[in-house]
Amino acid sequence: MQTLLKIGLGMVVLAVILVGTTFGVLRAHDIDGTARNGSRAMKSETRKVGTEVNIIILNGPIDLTLKQGATPSMVAIGEERLLPRVQTVQEGNTLTIALKESLFHLNRPLRVELTLPTLQQLTVHGSGDSAVGGFSGDALVLAMHGSGDVRFDGAYRHVHASLSGSGDLELALANGEDVDLSMLGSGSVTASGQSKSLSAHLMGSGDLAAEKMQADAVAIDVMGSGDANVYAKQSATLDVKGSGDIDVHGNPPHRQVSRMGSGDVSWAKD
């Protein structure tokens, strides 16, 4: 009997030790997986960035504010204890912004404010939101693979944007020649401005709201459940293979429609 009591008492002591150790570990990591090194106070930290950078890759839950300016600069903003985890690595003309380790929970978002002379490509992975403005040039490639949203305001002749995640894209473009959109995930696109041509391939569930993007020629291919709302001045070439609907504004004189799915095509009277 005494042996059983000793065993039971030993198990209780062991359980208390384990609970205490676990609580200590969680306390050391603030319960959310972040080490308690440094203060929770907000802090800004200047990072180096070269003039040759024109390609940005954003990974993780980091918000990005990117604007055009003659002199490149970069500032990381967040809780002091977390800033060392924000990694900014430049290789040639490519700057990668990412976290060294994953974080379970952020009380306040991490943010990077970046100024560059030119921009050719932006790739977004993860949940960070991006606001981009002031850039112009010949060609822009924009790729979104995560849940982060992107707002882009600029002037490029050729724009190619692809969405394969759940993040939404807001495009404001001035006097472009062609805009090409590829939509595979659940993310939606809102587009405004002017372009000679607009082509869009909708293969996911995300919607395209481009009735404020005035294009001379529009080519829309719907293979998913997403709906498209567009504006065509001269011609509209529409191919519906999915369940998504297409609504065309602008009363274009040249119209070509192919329907193999359950989606409908309508022509707005405006």
What are the language-model segments listed below?
Residues M1-D270:
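Intrinsically disordered, low-complexity terminal regions
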